[in-house]
Amino acid sequence: IETIETIFEKRDQAENWFKFCHTFLMPYTTSIISNPAYTGADEVVAGDFIRQQFAYNWAGFYIGDGLQMTADPYGNIWRKDAAYNAIRYCNTFLEKIGGVYNMEEQEKVLWIAEIKALKAHYYFELLRRYGPIILVPKNVATNAGIGEMKQPRAPFDTCVEEIVTLLDEAMKDLPPMNQKSVSRRA
């Protein structure tokens, strides 16, 4: 039976977790359909033809047309399977990577730095879309009480400081772009 502890025993399994932490990133940043930053302004317009021809939820078009909703917002990354889930995976990685026995320390340091930068990006995306957010430096236990699970939003400046801190910590261990192998370039 595979558990989080057994996943973080061997490098190959830890690498799968490492890669999975990155999978949440693509829909938020690169998708013209789900990232409202591309099409959510008044400069881009679309008629019903676009909406009816494609089964996709063109979040930006709806926002640009003034149809954003509070109950079920377009481009929502606060939902349970999005950014905070990604942050939880990143936190788990940061907590458990030290237990991998067949991995060089230098590679662990590199992966930790990349995950910190990734976590900072998830925080940035949340902050950009929602203003002050809930910061999660460590995972809350799944069996924690409601009082422990209810966390307040941090002030805006604190959120920015946390993002900068994570990036500063990551930067000192990440090689410059021209020194990375092609497969490691973002």
Task: Explain the meaning of each model-derived region.
Residues 171-172:
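Amphipathic alpha-helical segments of tetratricopeptide repeats
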